[in-house]
């Protein structure tokens, strides 16, 4: 919610007036959630929770799928609202460092997804036409934004959630990342 509030409220088209790093937004969101739930927390507990967030692990099939894509010569990348430092830590802890061609952060454009400028980072980096990109996300809102941008989209819907009630549905939906291999044939 905070990323959208910042992106929508910033009067500067370059996103420089209200922009904060995703790490700072994540910390602010944690503080808000704890306060809303009436949970007492200390800075030590907050730091411990944030450290956990920085060491995310991959879902069981992810490394195998990325290895298969690497073997096929398919370019792979992450486009994230996360800051470069967050992404570097997460990619390393998940064991994906050697399996990605690029790790792209919206930090460089100071606008969060779902702004078109954020999705343009993929096109600028790889030079592919949007329709030639298979954009994969576990977030329905992100798949919708990418669909509107013109990417071919795959929504990884692990929890069986309903699709967004506005806009076009993603072109593909699957339960886990192995669906990428099916979509690409």
Feature names for model-found ranges:
Residues 14-17, 49-52, 71-73, 103-105, ...:
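A short, structure-level motif marking secondary-structure boundaries and short turns
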Residues 3-47:
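A metal-dependent, Asp-based hydrolase signature
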Residues 67, 83-84, 88-185:
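Asp-based, Mg2+/Mn2+-dependent phosphohydrolase catalytic module
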Residues 26-32, 50-55, 84-86, 108-109:
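Short acidic/polar alpha-helix capping motifs at helix-coil junctions
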Residues 1-2, 49-53, 137:
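A general structural motif at alpha-helix termini
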Residues 19, 23-24, 39-78, 88, ...:
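Short, acidic loop-to-helix structural element flanking the phosphoryl-transfer center
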Residues 6-16, 55-64, 152:
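Short amphipathic alpha-helical segments at helix boundaries and their inter-helical linkers
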């Amino acid at each position: 919610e905070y990323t959208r509030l910042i992106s929508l409220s910033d009067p500067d088209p370059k996103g420089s007036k209200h922009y904060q790093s995703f790490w700072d937004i994540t910390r602010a969101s944690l503080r808000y959630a704890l306060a809303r739930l009436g949970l007492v927390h200390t800075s030590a507990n907050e730091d411990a929770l944030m450290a956990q967030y920085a060491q995310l692990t991959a879902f069981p099939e992810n490394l195998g799928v990325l290895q298969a894509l690497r073997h096929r010569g398919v370019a792979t990348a992450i486009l994230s609202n996360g800051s470069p430092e967050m992404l570097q830590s997460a990619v390393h802890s998940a064991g994906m460092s050697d399996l990605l061609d690029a790790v792209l952060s919206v930090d460089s454009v100071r606008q969060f997804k779902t702004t078109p400028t954020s999705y343009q980072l993929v096109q600028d980096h790889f030079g592919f036409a949007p329709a030639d990109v298979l954009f994969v996300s576990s977030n329905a809102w992100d798949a919708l934004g990418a669909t509107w941008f013109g990417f071919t989209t795959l929504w990884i819907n692990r929890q069986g959630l309903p699709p967004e009630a506005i806009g076009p549905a993603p072109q593909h939906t699957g339960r886990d990342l192995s669906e990428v291999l099916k979509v690409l044939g």
